[in-house]
Amino acid sequence: MQLIKRIILFVYVVMLLVLAAATFIEYFHGTSAAACIYHHVFFIAGWGILALLTLWILYRLRMWKRMSVFLLHSSFVVILAGALITFLTGTTGDIHLRIGTSTFQFVEHETNLVQTLPFRVELDTFRVEHYPDTEIPSDYVSSVRCTSFADSSSIQTDISMNNVLDWQGYRLYQSSYDDDWGGSWLGVNYDPWGTTVTYLGYLILGISMMAFMFKKRNVVYILLLGITLLIAYLYQMNAQKSPLLPVLSSPLLGVHVSFIMVAYTLLGIISLNGVIGLFLSRKEEKLMAISRFLLYPAVVFLGIGIFVGAVWASISWGRYWAWDPKEVWALITFMVYGLAFHSKSFPSFSCPRFFHIYMIVAILTVVMTYLGVNHLLGGMHSYG
């Protein structure tokens, strides 16, 4: 058993290092270079090893007797299974249409080959909507008509930011537009099974996290959850009064940002508590207990924020994960802090001094996610 745990820890750390390195490789050598890492057989095998060994540990320890813990770890396996299905069976591409033209083909991203759709897409109109009394775009809208080859059925609908067309297993989403506003670029995503399995994993994860927190029956956790939801509501109400980028005009914005920011705040407090713990050696155990108390909601909220963001990405861009640098560093942060819960498997986390030092170092992943990506690595999330 100890050997298996050491193998898991080794692979886990290697995957963290590879994820971090990939973001810098993307910065220096471009997205295609990073994609070579994310699609490499050894990268996929690393996740597979972690998933299989996790299942083996769950079986050997009969974790189903602790249902919330069992569901929590099982959800990660389901999410990884969904990601594998997406990788093996999914495809993405682009369609370019001028107003009044139609096509039944798209150019696949990975191979640049022309692929065929089971229906024809015609662009009736394209328009850019603006906020009242301003020239600031509020949305990009493509009015399209789709006609099926199988039964000649057709639909007419608008595709815009945060409004994806889902038809016959394909998802079409607003990607870009021509400078003269006479044409539109639509993204194409075909992934009927991978997304479904991944969403199932998200659902299991959410249920297990909530069960884990409420199982503690701690009023502070419940208050934190309530305060976070209130912040999300107020954030969304304020956002509706201010011009936003079209992609940000989503009700999920407030939930995503609020949970992430509350999580970062709690992790910052834990880091500060760690510094105090190193100087006050007589109280280091008590301070460690406080940090552990705060770590539960911090990681739970971070997980909720990440996966709400993934759902939002699926609605906005047609895909739930794009290996954007901020996504990757948020995942790294989640994994780094998640490791600290496993003190029974890794006894070092039971040592107050080690725990405090770990929490101090771990905050660097938060700093990198929140500031480093925006000011150094860039990516889709670098709005600031």
Per-range role (PLM):
Residues M1-G384:
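Solvent-exposed, non-transmembrane regions of integral membrane proteins
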